[in-house]
């Protein structure tokens, strides 16, 4: 079948990163819906990678047809794992981690290359991590409206 006869996937599944929920995708959601895409936003519990992959695969299963997975930050790890689903035809990483076999987010940020920004992760409290609110907009949501980035910083999910 010629490539021109294949229709582009219309299902896009957005996967948020750590520290936030799916509401950070609102502007992207509106833009894609306006262009005629069927967009779903995963609300991962951020308890474990296995749980997040399971929730993402549940959203993939609910789609009628091929799916493009889009992940931001830690969401890249999730889409890497969930991307082996037969419905998934593409992965899009937006400022996201794309670990190789055996790598984790921790191993990727442990020894950053010289000059690379270091995530402003605060010391754990009760076993949970948060980003420094003052540094959140520049480090996590640099291309987001400042008001939206500040809201995301104040509504972080540990």
Enumerate the predicted regions with their spans:
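Glycine-rich His-Gly loop
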Residues: 15-18, 72-73, 96
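Glycine-rich FAD cofactor-binding loop and adjacent beta-loop-alpha segment at the N-terminus
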Residues: 56, 70, 91
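Active-site catalytic motif of lipid deacylating hydrolases and related acyltransferases
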Residues: 5-65
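Gly/Ala-rich beta-loop-alpha elbow adjacent to hydrolase catalytic centers
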Residues: 70-75, 79
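Short glycine/proline-enriched coil/turn segments at helix->beta-strand junctions
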Residues: 35-37, 62-66, 84-89, 157
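Flexible "cap/lid" loop of the alpha/beta hydrolase fold
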Residues: 84-133
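Conserved alpha/beta-hydrolase catalytic His-Asp/Glu region
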Residues: 128-158
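Active-site signature of alpha/beta-hydrolase-fold catalytic machinery across serine-
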Residues: 27, 81-82
């Amino acid at each position: 079948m010629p490539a021109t006869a294949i229709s582009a996937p219309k299902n896009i599944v957005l996967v948020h990163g750590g520290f936030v929920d799916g509401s950070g995708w609102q502007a992207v959601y509106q833009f894609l819906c306006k262009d005629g895409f069927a967009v779903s936003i995963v609300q991962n519990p951020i308890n474990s990678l296995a749980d997040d992959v399971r929730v993402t695969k549940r959203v993939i299963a609910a789609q009628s047809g091929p799916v493009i997975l889009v992940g931001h930050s830690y969401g890249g790890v999730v889409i890497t794992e969930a991307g082996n689903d037969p419905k998934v035809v593409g992965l899009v990483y937006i400022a996201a981690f794309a670990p190789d076999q055996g790598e984790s987010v921790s191993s990727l940020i442990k020894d950053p290359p010289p000059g690379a920004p270091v995530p402003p992760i605060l010391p754990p409290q009760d076993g949970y991590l948060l980003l420094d609110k003052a540094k959140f907009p520049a480090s996590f949501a640099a291309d987001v409206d400042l008001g939206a980035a500040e809201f995301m910083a104040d509504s972080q999910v540990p």
